[in-house]
Amino acid sequence: LTFGNERSVTLAAGEEKVSDAVTYRLRPQQRLAITVNYGERTPDEASCHRGARTTSYIISGESVPEADFSKGEEAVHWYNIASIEVEGRDQTAIAVLGNSITDGRGSTTDAQDRWTDFFAEGLSKDPATSHIGVLNLGIGGNCVLRGGLSEPGVVRFDRDILGQSGLSAIIIFEGTNDIGSFGENDPTVGDRLIAAYQEFIRKGHERGLKVYGATI
């Protein structure tokens, strides 16, 4: 991968970069590995997906295509890579806003058996829906309104959901943590969740997207 035709890139804290496009044919549900080589200094704290349920392998020194990762340190997180954007002919996608239920809580490490994985597999097997992909934007411990882990849904919706390319629909499957964390002491949580959902729906419809809600 290159960034502006350069084989290396420097990121400031909180900064995002998009690589140059690369020609690489992918199949639906194909697993993909990305190797990140750090320069002279490894970051003290690397941004990561805490609940990836997928193993990363860490070795010292610069990796090469023949690098042996079998003796590397294992970590069940993804590091640094926020997303992969894939171009396809007549392809669309459904983005899912969710918490740990969507992120993969209870699924099997390295098996890719979250509910969104089964959903994507089912869509790909039906000729009528095989052109539709599924984008899992679930974050364990996430809330819609406030608190929880990472930015709440009302903050990250525009970036994480509407910022995706090629969308045709959105599924909103979040709110459990708001009710469980604040509902007992805050009787307004229900009404404020409804207001947040209505705002998500409005924004989605403005983009011409279908918006589906999941029961919580």
Where do the model's predicted regions map?
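N-terminal secretory targeting modules
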Residues: 1-97, 107-109, 128
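Extracytoplasmic/secreted cell-surface and envelope-processing proteins
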Residues: 43-44, 104-105, 144-146, 179-184
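Catalytic nucleophile-elbow at a beta strand-turn-alpha helix junction centered on a G-D-S/GDSL motif
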Residues: 91-117, 140-143
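Structural recognition of the beta-strand scaffold that forms the well-ordered cores
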Residues: 93-98, 102, 132-138, 168-173, ...
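Alpha-helical cap/lid subdomain in secreted, periplasmic
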Residues: 110, 117, 121, 125-127, ...
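Mobile, glycine- and charge-enriched loop segments
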Residues: 126-144
